Amino acid sequence: MKTSYLHTNQWFWGESVDIVSADGAAMVCVKFDKKTFPKAGYICDLSVIPTQRKQGLGSKMMQYALDVCREHEMTFARLHVDIKNVWLCEWYERLGFKELSRDEHELEMIKEL
């Protein structure tokens, strides 16, 4: 994948970093709330356009997100996923995420960095 665009935002709750692939086919956001979760970055909005899926782009974007977590001295990465999206839950497990909690709608997962 070519270079990615990183954009950092400061919010009242912390900081977020947006990562977009150079061709615009994929993006991910990593949020840091050091008051509530001082050692865990939160990965959200990982998306790949449908025509570019199953080519490793999502894995590369996730690696960028995990690298950003490490750069911010996080020791864990967290995310939520729709519990009905079995394929995606299994994909996150293959990437090393483990179940932290669940309710009837979503699964919270965590990965040690």
Task: Place the predicted regions along the sequence by residue.
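Acetyl-CoA-dependent GNAT
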Residues: 1-45, 49, 64, 68, ...
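Short, conserved structural micro-motifs that define repeat-unit consensus positions
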Residues: 27-29, 53, 80
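Conserved acetyl-CoA-binding loop-helix of GNAT-fold acetyltransferases
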Residues: 48, 54-67, 93-94
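Conserved active-site alpha-helix within GNAT-family acetyltransferase domains
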Residues: 59, 71, 83-101
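Methionine-biased hydrophobic packing positions in alpha-helices, especially
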Residues: 61-62, 74, 109
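Conserved GNAT acetyl-CoA-binding A-motif
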Residues: 69-80
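Conserved beta-strand-loop-alpha-helix junction that forms the acyl-donor binding cleft
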Residues: 79-88, 106-110
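Terminal substrate-recognition subdomain of acyl/acetyltransferases
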Residues: 98, 104-113
